[in-house]
């Protein structure tokens, strides 16, 4: 396969991140990597750009999801029921909008966010859940993929699990050519936010920033020659960008440690200081990142936590 076999298609989104890039891969099966959000504007842009390379929606044989977020999966609804929908099994409850899972998500965040110190009411949890699905789809996977698998019709591409930004996140790596279809693992012009997710009922929550940093270290070891990302331009200076992302994360983690050196704080209090201008508007994203830095510090045994009533406080360990 050559680089001409991967065709970038720029699809508008209603989100602050801007356009999402989906990829048409002309292998033995005509494959779309991600789909875009479920909007009329996105559907029109996708169809027009496919037509420019003489492809119709009905020609697409399979869609492979890098992860479940609405800007990547929502437009599945415009495809016929006969198309193959392929992705990590963790996509399924999100893209199918499974009601039992959505109810569990609501209960989980109704409990978690107050524990982290967020002034919260039950209506906010419901609104958060609804907003996550606003531009998504109601589809199901036809095939689940996992680490090390290949995909029929995409010879030479391997599935690698890269959780962090989403627990469902995978990339496709073509080792022979060094190319990677990277989803939101690494973006040229913005950081890829690790997002808090509800675990399976009965499980403990994941630690998205810890997972994300592990995925970045793995990406560094793989050392692809080019990453085709889910937003922005293709990335060729992969190692330099990974180090830049780590530098920013280390600096922010150190900021959090210094705050906790001064006094014990809740995660929400830390969030207010880290993101004073945007925490109210982007509460979930900023709390996800704040919780991530606290998870990293706990993993490094730099901080510990304790309960006061129903709220968790964090403090630095004595050095």
UniProtKB/Swiss-Prot annotation:
Q: Which cofactor does it need?
A: Zn(2+)
UniProt binding sites for Zn(2+) 2: 71-72, 184, 231
Residues where Zn(2+) 1 binds: 67, 69, 165, 184
Matching entries from Gene3D superfamilies are given as: Ribonuclease Z/Hydroxyacylglutathione hydrolase-like (3.60.15.10), Winged helix-like DNA-binding domain superfamily/Winged helix DNA-binding domain (1.10.10.10)
Binding note for cofactor: Binds 2 Zn(2+) ions per subunit.
Instruction: Tell me which UniProt keywords the record has, alphabetically.
Output: Hydrolase, Metal-binding, Zinc
Kindly give the InterPro entries that the UniProt entry links to this protein: Metallo-B-lactamas, NDM-1-like, RibonucZ/Hydroxyglut_hydro, WH-like_DNA-bd_sf
One molecular function GO term is:
hydrolase activity
Q: What is its EC number?
A: 3.-.-.-
What the entry lists under PANTHER family is as follows: METALLO-BETA-LACTAMASE DOMAIN-CONTAINING, METALLO-HYDROLASE YQJP-RELATED
What does the sequence similarity comment in the record state about its family? Belongs to the metallo-beta-lactamase superfamily.
What is the name of this protein? Probable metallo-hydrolase YqjP
